[in-house]
């Protein structure tokens, strides 16, 4: 029996998760969520909301988003169509990884997932047209506690995989996000 592969990123609970994928002549099968398995892997989380985004064009950038206080969210991110460069930023001021950025490529083909604990900001850049991202959250969306950081914040220095000279496709809200200035 195949096993789940878990790779810690940094010191704060951020995890790259690779589920066992079973393939045969029909295609493939894998579990993207199993509460017992995740608890056994040291990820005891209860998700309350599932979200999905469709980005029509390569170069679409969403984020960096987060929620604060009692509405902070842990998330499980996966890409079900296309591909993304996923970015998580540790925003916990007491963390040794404070303001450290972690990026991973997630795609429908590699079936990898990223578990992001509470206290992180999150964003992603689409690397293909028609990209679908699904994510689970352990707290409901609460507009009054949401925050964002500008995608090109120099303090974070995220090395987005944008082709030379390409400007990302942004929502008005993300384009107007503030810089963190070293928070």
Located regions from the model:
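Non-catalytic, conserved peripheral segments adjacent to functional cores
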Residues: 1-110, 128-130, 137-183
